[in-house]
């Protein structure tokens, strides 16, 4: 079952972003993943504004692929640069529908 990673970042230093973008996409792809979006155009519609200045959504075939990506030694220097350049939150969700009302999703 597909899983999604939601990366929320509040940038304090964006000097790492270009290098990260140029090098991390192939590492994501190596683990079967792909970026669905990566944007600095963040608008809070409801709830607390946490000051996120960059949000990315990635899709992977399964949770094991996310773990393999995150622990890949090739990714380590880019992950460290990202962590040093802002406040980060990475969340993983699966592709279920907890109430069973979305016709194209698997019920939980």
PLM features: what roles do these ranges have?
Residues 76-91:
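C-terminal structural segments of small proteins and small subunits
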Residues 1-71, 94-108:
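Short S/T/G/P-rich N-terminal loop/turn motif that feeds into the first structured element of a domain
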